[in-house]
Amino acid sequence: MSIETVREITEWLKDYRSDQVTITFHGGEPLLAGADFYRQALPILSEGLAHLAPTFALQSNLWRLTPELAQILAQYDIPVGSSIDGPEEINDLQRGKGYFKKTMRGYEIARANGLEVRFICTFTSRSVEHKEEIFNFFLRNGFPLKLHPALPSLRNENPKEWALEPEAYGELLVYLLDKYLENLGRIEIMNINDLCKCVFTRHGTVCTYVDCMGTTLAVGPDGSIYPCYRFVGMPEYVMGNVYDRPTPEDLARSDAGKLMQAFKDYVDRECGGCPHIKYCRGGCPYNAIAPTGGEIQGVDPHCVAYKRIFDEINDRVNEELYGSPVMETEDFGSPLRRKAKPGIMWILQTMATK
């Protein structure tokens, strides 16, 4: 992406909406842009969009991180997301030999320069068999854990070779919920935090579980606008271009915008009787639409997994509140009530105190 396009993005966003904006540098590999790009782009965006209180994030494998780049990013308190799938042997089996060492080398540079790095772990049909080893790796190293399930490839002759089946994903989430509760205070599992918050607030808290249309957009290198970063590079999902200064209404009128609205309408119709609809919203539109060539044939295929973990959390909350001992507490001078094992409310309490 050129600096000219960065300026055009800034001008477009100035009047697009009045909400606070978060800008994530994604790829490909965004560090390939180099230090000079960020040295110019970050002031343009932060000053030009000051009225929107912009914050920034970056997603990278960290291979190209240098002390110079790290220092530039640290000036803007940019958190970095990277990918590690567990111990070196498991990670490199999935991502290629040498990946682990290169990423950890970048991680050490980030740490030395005050950058916060959080790792995303992709669980596949193979690595899920080593879930305890992977969990212990994150626990032992003090890494917060965020996970993704491997999806069927759109570019492979054997698309499901590595894909994690929805049923297995649901059981993995329940397993990690249990492991989290066994190790509260020693590790943070971000997905579990988000899922518990969804249930408690009755509203989705991350893009997978909300109506993301119109609020989570991506801009390609040429200024093309997409519904989200996962659609970048797919011409049929271009909604407009920043050079044309489209309004939210303009984007909604595009073919891709109409498809996103059609998915939302489908969810309202097909999921109306689901107890989780308010904080699930049919899951991720990309997961539902991209594998079918743009045809709406169902909701996110991980619906089974989402129902499994949402049911589990709801059942446990109800049990904690109405059918089991409460957390140890003082009640206006009364004796301490019987101590309960840590549960969902402990997770919520931990989040609230941060």
Predicted regions and their residues:
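Flexible mid-to-C-terminal extensions adjoining Fe-S/redox cofactors in radical SAM and related proteins
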Residues: G233-K354
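Radical SAM/AdoMet-radical enzyme domain recognition
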Residues: I3-T24, A33-L154, E161-W162
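Active-site neighborhood of divalent metal-dependent phosphoester/pyrophosphate hydrolases
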Residues: G28-E29
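Radical SAM enzyme [4Fe-4S]-AdoMet core and its adjacent flexible, acidic
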Residues: Q94-A218, D222, R230-M239
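Generic recognition of stable, solvent-exposed alpha-helical segments in well-folded globular domains
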Residues: M1-E4, D36, K102-R105, E129, ...
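Short, basic, glycine/proline-bearing loop/turn elements
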Residues: T55-F56, I192, R253-S254
